[in-house]
Amino acid sequence: LAIKGLGQFQKYKQIASFRRLIEGWHVSDFRIESARSTNDAGYAEHLSATGDNLALVSQFMHEHYPDRFQQVLEKMAQRVPGIKSVEAKETADGRIVLRFQNEEFKDPFISRYVSDGTLKMFAYLILLYDPTPHPLLCIEEPENQLHPDLLLELGEEFRAYASNGGQVFISTHSPDFVNGVQLEELFWLCQRNNGFSKVVRASDDP
């Protein structure tokens, strides 16, 4: 609270800078049911922690950064068989819904009826192709709801995100995800007899 309060005053420039840094962090608490929800027509530039504004952010990216949104669609088509397009559509009652077009069907499916893995992969791609990357991105167990074959490519996406200047912290229990991680990128926690935990880098382990 002190950082947030003092950071609003111009004379505390260092605190204000620190405040902006923290406010730019993204600690994911992604929830499938939240991401399935529709949104009132509005405006959102960045994906929320739970993903409940996924439709609004998709609409924003499509309208303001069409090239990036096209990259997301191309990645989706590569990783989710049958996905032809995704669009955020406004309904007659002023709601924004995501519609997924499968090439084998005439009519698109709204987000409520697509698989958990399809929705989660789309949300991750929207997050990772954000035109304004977060300085710190924290993801817990990205393997949940995703097919193991997708994890290596997802790991590469996280690595590319980090190479653009941000930091990425990921906790995982998936050997498939770990297989795509370089040794110098991998750490684990060891519990010590004194009750504390020790962080060990895989490349330093004999």
Model-derived segments and spans:
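Short polybasic amphipathic segments
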Residues: 1, 97-101, 186-187
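Electropositive, glycine-dotted interaction segments
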Residues: 1-74
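Short small-residue beta-strand/loop micro-motif enriched in glycine and branched aliphatics
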Residues: 57, 106-110, 197
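Conserved ABC ATPase signature
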Residues: 74-129, 136-149
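Hydrophobic helix-cap positions at the C-terminus of alpha-helices
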Residues: 128-131, 161
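Residue-level preference for the first positions of well-ordered beta-strands
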Residues: 134-136, 167
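C-terminal lobe/lid and adjacent interdomain/linker elements of RecA-like ASCE P-loop ATPase modules
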Residues: 153-206
